[in-house]
Design a protein with these regions (language model features):
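Basic/polar N-terminal segments that are highly enriched at the extreme N-terminus
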Residues: 1-19, 23, 387
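Generic structural signal for well-ordered, non-transmembrane alpha-helical segments
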Residues: 22, 257, 284-291, 318, ...
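C-terminal helix-coil-helix/basic helical segment that borders enzyme active sites and/or dimer interfaces
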Residues: 29, 33-37, 271, 292-323, ...
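Glycine-rich flavin
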Residues: 43-51, 56-165
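DPxDG-like acidic metal-binding loop motif
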Residues: 156-193
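Glycine-rich phosphate/pyrophosphate-binding beta-alpha loops
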Residues: 158-163, 248-250, 360
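Glycine-rich beta->alpha junctions and the first turn(s) of the following alpha-helix
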Residues: 204-291
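Glycine-rich phosphate/cofactor-binding loops in nucleotide/flavin-utilizing enzymes
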Residues: 342-387
Length: 387
């Protein structure tokens, strides 16, 4: 039986996105265990995602999508990550790029006419959105040069997860005009553009199958009408309050799923022999760290439920992001000890989780800026330039 026959690909016959993720995850897990080349992008998994209903899951039903909430999307990604971290992390980038305009369509009706075409394309054409957030963040990156009718873009976007499968890169570039502060322009660029090239750069410790290659943009012209937003470079903007509040709970749900699977593998290995008191204590510590990661991710999702993105929700989300990473990494490190020497074998699958969880360290806000942001909030100081 083929993979397509193993799952029911008709979303209408599914109860939840978690049901779909659970069945797909079993397939993805088998593929990850059997992979001969971990550096290879998980293209076959994305093909299944594309026909499963998960690509359009976050689009409002009025626009043809599944109408999944951020909580449901987070649970979906957590479930996928339990089986294959690379697939889940790469897909989280598409997922948050859908969830953000979906939230705005629901809560910012004035923006709906601008957002609807993109959301309808995701629902109808099942296009994959890429995020260049790892390159751009608050400061922006790349150069936008004013030309007749638009802007010529020159940029190299690193950490573009899912690049081999992407249809539209959601990105930006910095426009510098005499006598004015640098401005970041936001826009989408079709990956089919002759001015766009995916560079084969992704050779990493973990999350090897995400295809997070550099994307080179040389001379693509974005029409003036295709720039829906612009902001000052190097300053937090209300748009980024929305982006960061929604995106990071989704991304860190992936790392929670990785940690949960590492825990279960370790317990399974430990049970194969008579555990001593030391192993029992390590297992208890591991479960406490995992509980900490779960609480941290839940706090992040609680910030989304407020439906009021602001500096305060950024603070809550980024505190959660830091705690989620810290506790998830600690849980997986303890899983290696609980498993003992058996966990050192690649066949166990634990060492892949150990490598994958390390990527939790590198997303914004990293520890220094995050602590500074939280401290400034506590002291009533400005935070608009802390990132």
């Amino acid at each position: 039986m083929s993979a397509m026959e193993m799952i029911n690909v008709n979303p209408a016959e599914r109860r939840t996105v978690i049901d779909i993720a659970r069945e797909l995850g079993a397939i993805f897990g088998e593929r990850a265990n059997a992979a001969k080349d971990e550096d290879k992008f998980v293209a076959d998994n994305f093909s299944l995602l594309n026909t499963s209903g998960l690509v359009e899951a976050g689009v409002p039903p009025e626009l043809g999508g599944g109408g999944a909430s951020v909580d449901e999307l987070a649970a979906m990604l957590r479930t996928l990550a339990y089986h294959c971290g690379s697939t889940a992390l790469a897909f989280s980038m598409h997922t948050h790029q859908v969830a953000i305009p979906a939230w705005r369509w629901t809560h910012q009706k004035a923006a709906a006419p601008v957002l609807e075409p993109l959301l309808k394309r995701v629902a109808k054409e099942r296009i994959i959105l890429l995020s260049s957030g790892g390159s751009d963040w608050i400061g922006g990156s790349g150069k936008a040069e004013k030309v007749d009718g638009g802007y010529r873009i020159t940029a190299r976007k690193v950490f573009s997860s899912g690049a081999p499968a992407g249809d539209l890169l959601m990105t930006g570039a910095v426009l510098e005009s005499e006598g004015e502060p640098p401005m970041v322009l936001h826009f989408g660029i079709p990956m089919s553009s002759p001015h766009v090239k995916v560079l084969d750069t992704w050779r990493t410790l973990g999350m090897r199958g995400t295809g997070s290659h550099d994307v080179q943009i040389d001379g693509h012209v974005v029409p003036e009408a295709a720039v829906p937003a612009r902001r000052k470079a190097g300053e937090w903007h209300p748009l980024f309050h929305i982006i960061a509040t929604i995106a990071f709970p989704l991304v860190y749900s992936v790392y929670l799923g990785v940690a949960e699977s590492a825990r279960d593998i370790a317990i399974g290995l430990a049970k194969k022999k008579q555990p001593n008191q030391h192993t029992i204590g390590l297992a208890g510590q591991m479960d406490m760290e995992l509980a900490g990661a779960r609480l941290a991710v839940e706090s992040m999702l609680a910030a989304v439920r407020l439906n009021a993105p602001s500096p305060a929700t950024i603070n809550q989300v980024m505190i959660g992001r830091q705690l989620a990473a810290r506790h998830a990494i600690a849980a997986v490190e303890l899983a290696m000890e609980v498993a003992g020497g058996a966990g050192f074998y690649r066949a166990a699958g634990l060492e892949r989780r150990f490598r994958d969880i390390q990527a939790a360290r590198y997303h914004p806000l990293q520890s220094g800026p995050q602590a500074e942001y939280a401290g400034a909030m506590a002291l009533g100081l400005p935070v608009d330039r802390i990132f």
